[in-house]
Amino acid sequence: MAGQGDTEVRIILVGKTGNGKSATANTILGRRQFDSKICANAVTKTCQRAYREWKGKNLVVVDTPGLFDTKETMKTTCFEISRCVLYSCPGPHAIILVLRLDRYTEEEQKTVALIKGLFGEAALKYMIILFTHKEDLEDQSLDNFVSDAGEKLNNIISQCGKRYLAFNNKAALDEQENQVQQLIELTEKMVAQNGGSYFSDKIYKDIDSRLNHCLEELKETYAQQLTSEIERIEKEYAAKLEKGKAAQIVFAQRNHDEKLRNLKEKAEETVFMYIFQKIKEILSKLWDELW
């Protein structure tokens, strides 16, 4: 999208409910942004986005709910995937599959299959496996843990280019920051191996184009509204004393500035249903196979 520089790093967190996606997001953000609790019901019910300025980079972290919760309908799942695509536009630098060290299920395989089904095999070139509960390794190295893991888990790791790391989301702040450093370095290395650019495909390019078009239309509309409002104020005060005119113009300008601050969100709202329909078309073909 317009206005986004090379310093932005967009990260999507995916995985099974309870694997620690929100806790991992909070570690990356350096603050408690998302609720993260050990409970029977998922804390994250909808796709969420948050930002952090970190060592000259603008991190965009997208936290997602468990997409394979059996109670969810296809409509709800389409909505969440659509939000994920919208929040990570024009494309993610990293898709992080969050796993627990002590728990690997069929849902992780389905998540990878879903990503391939939606975005193609090329998306796997941007995937990283992130294990939570690093503290449970104790004296064992992560490499040894992976080498001793079962065939299914190693198959997933291989599909993701054998890119993996582990987080202890309860660690002291300095250790958490070291983990973030490790993740960003792994992401940058992966992006460099992929030609130096973030992941993009037909869906992302289409949506980014529509968002940019919508942004320009909104800017033009808001500028016209401001001009019309100032002209109205000028006419109203033409036959009156100047007192109050300046305040009216300042108010109109502030209203215009507020609209510009919310420009991105307004554009996203405008194109959301288009994204939803595109995702629904693809997901309807995968639904019976994966759910």
From Swiss-Prot:
CDD domains: AIG1. The keyword Plastid does not apply. Residues 15-22 are annotated as: G1. InterPro entries: G_AIG1 (IPR006703), GIMA/IAN/Toc (IPR045058), P-loop_NTPase (IPR027417). The keyword Nucleotide-binding applies. Residues 6-208 form the AIG1-type G domain. Residues 132-135 are annotated as: G4. It comes from the Eukaryota. Expressed in thymus (in thymocytes), spleen (in splenocytes), lymph node and lung. Residues 168-170 are annotated as: G5. Residues 42-46 are annotated as: G2. Keywords: GTP-binding, Nucleotide-binding. GO terms for molecular function: GTP binding. Residues 63-66 are annotated as: G3. PROSITE patterns: G_AIG1 (PS51720). GTP binds at T17, G18, N19, G20, K21, S22, A23, K37, H133, K134, E135, N169. Belongs to the TRAFAC class TrmE-Era-EngA-EngB-Septin-like GTPase superfamily. AIG1/Toc34/Toc159-like paraseptin GTPase family. IAN subfamily. This is GTPase IMAP family member 9. It comes from Mus musculus. The lineage of its organism: Eukaryota, Metazoa, Chordata, Craniata, Vertebrata. The gene is Gimap9.
